């Protein structure tokens, strides 16, 4: 039976880990044991934060809409309720963009929402 030397495969594996650990602080970037655990942890954070990112952005959009709508004398909850009753289906991402960049359009939407709530 021939002797199997695994230098090439282990070097390739280590190289892969070190590539993922690039930019890490201290030993975590250049010793395999520390780098492996740091990369594994970073992947866990990656997975978790891809989910959290969606929540964070939705919260940001809601804050922007709320700020824009309150300037026009209405609360976020009443505004969303009014839009629903008026049959206007615009998602929060677009509404926040409108609130930031197009105040006239937001004002028109608020008026529509108020009219729908009054009816």
From Swiss-Prot:
The UniProt entry, under Pfam families, shows: Ribosomal_L20 (PF00453)
Q: Does the keyword GTP-binding belong to this entry?
A: no
One MF term in the entry's GO annotations:
rRNA binding
Keyword rRNA-binding present in the record's keywords: the answer is: yes
Q: What InterPro entries does the record tag this protein with?
A: Ribosomal_bL20 (IPR005813), RIBOSOMAL_L20_CS (IPR049946), Ribosomal_protein_bL20_C (IPR035566)
HAMAP family with a match to the protein in the record: Ribosomal_bL20 (MF_00382)
Belongs to which family?
Answer: Belongs to the bacterial ribosomal protein bL20 family.
Protein name as annotated: Large ribosomal subunit protein bL20
The organism encoding this protein is Azorhizobium caulinodans (strain ATCC 43989 / DSM 5975 / JCM 20966 / LMG 6465 / NBRC 14845 / NCIMB 13405 / ORS 571)
């Amino acid at each position: 039976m021939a002797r199997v030397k695994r230098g090439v495969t282990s070097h390739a594996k280590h190289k892969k880990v070190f590539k993922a650990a690039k930019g890490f602080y201290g030993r975590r970037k250049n010793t395999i044991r520390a780098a492996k655990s740091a990369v594994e942890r970073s992947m866990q954070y990656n997975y978790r934060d891809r989910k959290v990112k969606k929540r964070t952005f939705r919260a940001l959009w809601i804050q922007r809409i709320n700020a824009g709508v309150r300037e026009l004398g209405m609360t976020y909850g009443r505004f969303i309720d009014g839009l629903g009753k008026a049959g206007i289906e615009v998602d929060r991402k677009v509404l926040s963009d409108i609130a930031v960049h197009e105040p006239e359009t937001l004002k028109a939407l608020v008026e529509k929402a108020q009219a729908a709530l009054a009816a």
